[in-house]
A protein has these predicted regions:
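Conserved phosphate-binding elements of NTP-dependent enzyme cores
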Residues: 1-940
Length: 940
């Protein structure tokens, strides 16, 4: 009997309060609620975790030994579970070899298409390659060389050095009499050899005959022997005209003699030695020594540190060698680098085969010392390739510059792989097309194929079109197959995985998604909802953790977790249909039914009259745009996904300002010039990267408030009597921490073939500190008790300590009152990490001339959280600062003082500034997609 519901009973994970939930199977369910209310705890840490645990329990004990920790979630019972697949936001793949094409497997089908239906061309002459059977070669010779004397040759050596004495002797013993060396036919003699230092072309003479029809059997036999001897390739030499013609069983260019092996899918893979460019090994880029970084100041002498990797003069062999080289050119180590002759610099950098003489008095030997000098570049390269020392590699990396591979020009593949075409494009050109352009190419390319290839390609093209359509449906038309996975945003990588899952056509699966609408313009939201419904209609259950209003209204079922966040959340405040939800009064329902709303400001700020102007920005898809950022305003940059917003702000504006203000090493994308940069004195880029990589990092340590809290405890009477220093109250150093667990508060128990178990430390019971440290108390609370407080509790507790209150109050103001002061940074979402960073900046004194940059700060935020966040940002602008936000959320866009709309499309169809002005001015514009969705929000 099949169950119609997924039933969760007694869920207590994190802040969930023993809740019971029912979710209908084969439906689209949205789990919503305030940030920190417990949505992810229910969806991922309870339902998904239990589904995974049950799946792994079906493995043998031996197989389970190789899998990660799968603890049973704290729940009484879950019934009705299907196999579960989680599609999260995290961009987990940092491998430079992973691309959109490899992730979606579209590139695999492209490789198959080019291997089976591609036409080969010579990369030397550009002519179409041909291949011959032995029968065809015999027929051509009888027709075209009738009555002529010809030599039938097998190529043995092509443009290689060597004396080839053994080869000649081997041919002589096989009974061959003549050989052609560098165009000259010679008799093979005993001991024969050629100049070993020159490149040679060598062919063995298989037969020489007058071509007549009566000799066709002899000709046939000679051609077969020649093909075998020449590995499928032969040459016909016309004795009278002294011209040769090439024939091959393999693909060959008759004019140049160039031949390829039969194409196979691996030949088009940049991850296979058969296809990868030999110079960059399939990466498309190479790391090379940048001489500008090695010698930044040519006015210095080598003795004073002109060559940065070597530093200033030391009594070392490398300096003695360089000095000996310089003396040959009338210079020494004290000569300014700019005055050293070019020949000497070339030897110092690249080395020389000629030995360098070092005077015996320097090396303290009985005679002069002779040694070859390999050069500074070789020295740095050796350090860089030293696998045993990560520190040395990191040190050497600072002198590298990444550039396009000079051999494949960024195409990643060998020359012969790029010489195959389908239609009029090679595989790299196809992979560089936007998905929308690729879709057009796929729909027309079949008509350009030869009849035989058309039949072969039909099924492959059909599969390619299907998979490309799935990417179009989830709003990723602006990406290309060659786009690296590591460069994708969390929302983009999630939607790629969603498209892959739709393409897999699985049924009876439970899919759980985490905010798939992140980074999507309202235009593309409709496509996403359609894709999720398609996944449901295949016969699957889809659970989405989401705050988007359109997604909630399109759902079959809604579970609202609340009423507030943290300890005040963790309850089911509503479960039912969207229609029924509108009749309730939960915080979410109030925003959906119009009882609550974020009000449109009555007046837009005028700013301070100053601005920053960037002219000629042309990074990625930007089309030499000029853009002005009026200061003292809340600026929102809008546009569809892939239109160029992040390129303009994160890759152009932010690096320009950082270079000017802080001498940042990050290079901005190309632009012509910038004006007004002196109108600000500080730039703060608040991104969503983690605030720490280890469980020891937490909001208290990141904001710096933990230092103040430790100082407070050090100055307590009990601490002074005991002579404690601030380090006593740190869980990172010996002294005050619990040594049984090293200040972690827990221990990891290895269970061999069972998953590792994390248990609270039996000595400190999770407190992280030893007994003596915990005896020091402030207002009855130990340092461990303080770290266990939520931000809201800490604000009340430290209300009379101004320096501490200021920092934790800022965390409360950005809507993080529910998280704990000592909560591990690894448990914070990207949105929470971003708000911790924002709170840290808020607690600092601003100058009134600061520019703040935020990329989608509403990620993971409920309507109510957005209202709180925007109140904070509004206060920053009210103090004279400028806030630049990249955002799709209409509640944020309508609050802007100034909008910069980028578009009109994504990818190559974008990159233009299509409208700027107040929300009211942009809303009445006829350009782009933003006005259509903004008008109703403003009541226009």
């Amino acid at each position: 009997m099949t169950q119609d519901w997924i039933t969760v009973e007694g869920a207590r994970v994190h802040n969930l309060k023993n809740i019971d939930v029912k979710i209908p199977r084969n439906s689209l369910t949205v789990i919503t609620g305030l940030s920190g209310s417990g949505k992810s705890s229910l969806a991922f840490d309870t339902i998904y975790a239990e589904g995974q645990r049950r799946y792994i329990d079906t493995f043998s004990a031996y197989a389970r030994n190789f899998l990660g920790n799968m603890e049973r979630p704290d729940v009484d019972k879950i019934s009705g579970l299907s196999p579960v697949i989680s599609i999260e936001q995290k961009t987990t793949n940092k491998n430079p070899r992973s691309t959109v094409g490899t992730t979606t497997e579209i590139y695999d089908y492209l490789r198959l298409l080019f291997a089976r239906a591609g036409t080969a061309y010579s990369y030397v002459t550009g002519e179409k390659m041909v291949k011959y059977t032995e029968e065809k070669v015999v027929g051509l010779i009888l027709d075209e060389y009738a009555g002529k004397k010809v030599f039938i040759l097998s190529p043995l050596v092509r443009q290689r050095k060597g004396h080839y004495r053994e080869l000649f002797e081997s041919m002589r013993r096989k009974g061959y009499l003549y050989i052609r060396v560098d165009g000259e036919v010679k008799e093979i003699t005993r001991g024969m050899k050629v100049d070993r230092y020159k490149n040679h072309n060598i062919e063995i003479v298989i037969d020489k005959l007058m071509v007549e029809p009566k000799d066709d059997e002899r000709l046939r036999h000679s051609i077969a022997t020649a093909m075998k001897q020449g590995d499928g390739t032969i040459m016909i030499l016309d004795k009278d005209s002294d011209t040769t013609r090439n024939f091959s069983k393999r693909l060959m260019d008759p004019a140049s003699g160039l031949s390829y092996g039969d194409p196979a899918p691996n030949m088009f893979s940049f991850n296979s030695p058969e296809g990868a460019c030999p110079r960059c090994h399939g990466l498309g880029i190479v790391d090379e020594i940048d001489l500008k970084k090695v010698i930044p100041n040519q006015n210095l002498s080598i003795r004073d540190g002109a060559i940065v990797p070597l530093g200033k003069y030391k009594n070392q062999m490398i300096f003695w060698q360089i000095d000996a080289i310089l003396q040959k050119y009338g210079c020494d180590l004290k000569t300014p680098y700019k005055d050293i002759p070019d020949e000497a610099i070339d030897t110092i950098m690249n080395g020389s085969l000629e030995s360098v003489r070092i005077d015996k008095s320097i090396v303290h030997t009985s005679s002069d010392y002779f040694v070859t000098f390999e050069g500074v570049i070789k020295y740095l390269t050796d350090v860089m390739n030293d696998d045993d020392s990560a520190a040395s590699q990191k040190w050497a990396a600072q002198f590298l510059a990444t550039s396009e591979c000079p051999e494949c020009h960024g195409n990643r593949l060998k020359k012969e792989s790029l010489a195959f075409k389908v239609g009029d494009k090679n595989i790299s050109e196809v992979a560089n097309l936007d998905i929308s352009e690729l879709n057009e190419w796929l729909s027309t390319v079949e008509d350009k194929l030869e009849p035989q290839n058309k039949k072969i390609a039909h099924e492959i093209l059909k599969e390619l079109k299907t998979r490309v359509n799935f990417l179009l449906e989830v709003g990723l038309d602006y990406l290309s197959l060659n786009r690296q996975s590591a460069s994708l945003s969390g929302g983009e990588s999630q939607r790629i995985r969603l498209a892959t899952q739709i393409g897999s056509q699985l049924v009876n699966v439970l899919y759980i998604l985490d905010e798939p609408s992140i980074g999507l313009h309202q235009r593309d939201n409709e496509k996403l909802i359609r894709s999720l419904k398609e996944l449901r209609d295949l016969g699957n259950t889809v659970i989405v953790v989401e705050h988007d209003e359109d997604m909630m209204r399109a759902a079959d079922w809604i579970v609202d977790i609340g009423p507030k966040a943290g300890r005040k959340g963790g309850e089911v405040v509503f479960e039912g249909t969207p229609k029924d939800m509108l009749k309730t009064h939960t915080i979410t329902a109030q925003y959906l039914n119009g009882e609550s709303r974020i009000a449109v400001p009555a007046v837009r700020r005028q700013g301070n009259g100053k601005s920053i102007k960037i002219m000629g920005a042309c990074g990625n898809n930007l089309k030499h745009v000029d853009v002005e950022f009026p200061l003292g305003k809340l600026i929102v940059v809008t546009g569809v996904s892939g239109s160029g917003k992040s390129t303009l702000i994160n890759e152009t504006l932010a690096p320009i300002l950082s270079q000017h203000l802080y001498r940042s090493l990050k290079k901005p994308m190309p632009y012509d010039k910038v004006e007004g940069i002196d109108n600000i004195d500080k730039v703060v880029n608040v991104d969503q990267s983690p605030i720490g990589r280890t469980p020891r990092s937490n909001p208290a340590t990141y904001t710096g408030v933990f230092t103040d809290i430790r100082s407070l405890f050090v100055n307590l009477p009990e601490a002074k009597i005991r002579g404690y220093k601030p380090g006593r109250f740190s869980f990172n150093v010996k002294g005050g921490r619990c040594e049984a667990c090293g200040g972690n508060g827990y221990k990891v128990i290895e269970m061999n073939f069972l998953p590792n178990v994390t248990v609270p430390c039996e000595v400190c019971h999770g407190k992280r500190y030893n007994r003596e440290t915990l005896e020091v108390r402030y207002k009855g609370k130990s340092i461990a008790d303080v770290l266990d407080m939520t931000i809201n509790q800490a604000v009340e507790f430290f209300e009379n300590v101004p320096n501490i209150l200021q920092k934790i109050k800022s965390l409360q103001e950005v809507g993080l009152g529910y998280i704990k002061l000592g909560q591990s940074s690894t448990t914070l979402s990207g949105g929470e990490s971003q708000r911790v960073k924002l709170a840290t900046e808020l607690s600092k004194r601003d100058t009134g001339k600061t520019l703040y940059i935020l990329d989608e700060p509403t990620t993971g935020l409920h309507f109510e959280d957005i209202r709180i966040l925007m109140d904070v940002l509004e206060k920053l602008v009210d103090r004279g600062n400028t806030v630049v936000i990249i955002e799709h959320n209409l509640d944020v866009i309508k609050l802007a003082d100034w909008i910069i709309d980028v578009g009109p499309e994504g990818g190559r169809g974008g990159g233009q500034i299509i409208s700027t002005g107040t929300p009211e001015q942009v809303a009445v514009s006829s350009k782009g997609y933003t006005p259509r969705f903004l008008k109703p929000m403003l009541g226009i």
